[in-house]
């Protein structure tokens, strides 16, 4: 049986460092990571450069432990408040994130669309496919 943890910006395990600490502390071959790229991004690290540094850490520190990828759109209002967006309008650096994911040893990674809106399925699928 496998068990997976997920970094969530607004929770206790909210940075690559925190995920790495949990993985190192538990040290189980059955512990994996669900990688939701949006969950690593907050208003202070929403720039592409800051996100590329995050993706470098995720890939090098525990990329081989990633078992699935979540995909959702988000952005931040001027006051820093999180808001859901269409994938095309997201502040998430999906290009950089998927460049990192393509370097991992896993032959296949399931990608799960979160917060899906059926009316946008075609545009969501086209957007996601642009990274493969």
Language model features with spans:
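Acidic/histidine-rich catalytic cores of soluble enzymes
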Residues: 1-91
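Intrinsically disordered, low-complexity regions of eukaryotic proteins
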Residues: 8, 81, 116-117, 126
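Alpha-helical elements of Rossmann-like donor-binding domains used by nucleotide-donor carbohydrate transfer enzymes
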Residues: 18-21, 57, 96, 100, ...
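Conserved hydrophobic residues forming the short capping helix/wall of the S-adenosyl-L-methionine
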Residues: 23-26, 101, 132
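A short, acidic, flexible beta-alpha connecting loop/helix-capping segment that sits on the rim
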Residues: 75, 111-121
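H/E-rich (His + Asp/Glu) clusters that bind or coordinate divalent metals
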Residues: 86, 90, 95-97, 102-104, ...
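C-terminal helical cap(s) of enzyme catalytic domains, especially alpha/beta-barrels
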Residues: 118-132
């Amino acid at each position: 049986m496998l068990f997976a943890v997920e970094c969530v910006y607004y929770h206790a395990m909210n940075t690559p460092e925190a995920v790495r600490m949990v993985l190192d502390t538990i040290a189980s071959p059955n512990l994996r990571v669900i990688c939701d790229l949006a969950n690593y991004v907050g208003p202070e690290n929403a720039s592409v450069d800051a996100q590329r540094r995050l993706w470098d850490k995720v890939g090098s520190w525990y990329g081989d432990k990633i078992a699935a990828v979540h995909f959702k759109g988000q952005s931040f209002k001027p006051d820093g408040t999180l808001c859901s967006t269409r994938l095309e309008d997201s502040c998430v650096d999906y290009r950089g994130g998927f460049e990192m994911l393509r370097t991992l040893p896993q032959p296949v990674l399931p990608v799960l669309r979160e917060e899906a809106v059926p009316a946008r399925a075609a545009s969501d699928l086209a957007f996601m496919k642009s990274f493969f």
